[in-house]
């Protein structure tokens, strides 16, 4: 588990970035695969999600997941939609206490957001396509719709590096 030094100083938020190690999955999904849409055994994925929930000290019923589509779509989780548990988007945010927001990445960039004054949390899956199409800007705009101020903190998690990621020239 990895932590943001800055986020560790905030009293009202618990956060971490998990590595791929320490779970139940085997083979190409070894070992902490939390991707419900993967072809991994659903039992392994659910066991991994339960492990994450325990480490975060919350009920697995309070772990909010996304079906990530490399889009720029952001969903605000509220009392009306909280029971969906899995949202088709690449960012989720909420003001509700007692919930954990999750983003699953391999190469893409996980980002955690926090408005310390208004107690708004969010997380985003920023792949190159979503980043180019505004996932970060859209996430911040949704924060502002919830009356966030300009003191939104962000922590960027582990992701693929430039030396390990090839793109065609037309990408630039």
Where in the sequence are the language-model features?
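Active-site microenvironment for binding and transforming phosphate-containing groups
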Residues: 1-172
């Amino acid at each position: 588990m990895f932590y943001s030094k800055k986020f560790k100083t905030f009293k009202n938020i618990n956060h971490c970035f998990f590595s791929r190690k320490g779970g139940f999955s085997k083979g190409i999904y070894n070992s902490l695969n939390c991707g419900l849409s993967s072809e991994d055994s659903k039992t392994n994925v659910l066991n991994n999600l339960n492990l994450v929930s325990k480490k975060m000290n919350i009920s697995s019923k309070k772990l909010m997941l996304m079906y990530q589509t490399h889009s720029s779509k952001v969903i605000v989780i509220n009392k009306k939609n909280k029971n969906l548990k899995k949202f088709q988007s690449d960012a989720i945010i909420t003001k509700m206490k007692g919930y954990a927001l999750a983003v699953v990445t391999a190469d893409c960039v996980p980002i955690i957001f926090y408005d310390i004054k208004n107690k708004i949390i969010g997380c985003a899956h920023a792949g190159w396509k979503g980043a180019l199409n505004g996932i970060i800007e859209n996430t911040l705009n949704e924060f502002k719709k919830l009356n966030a101020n300009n003191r939104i903190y962000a922590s960027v998690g582990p992701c693929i590096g430039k030396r390990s990621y090839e793109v065609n020239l037309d990408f630039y």
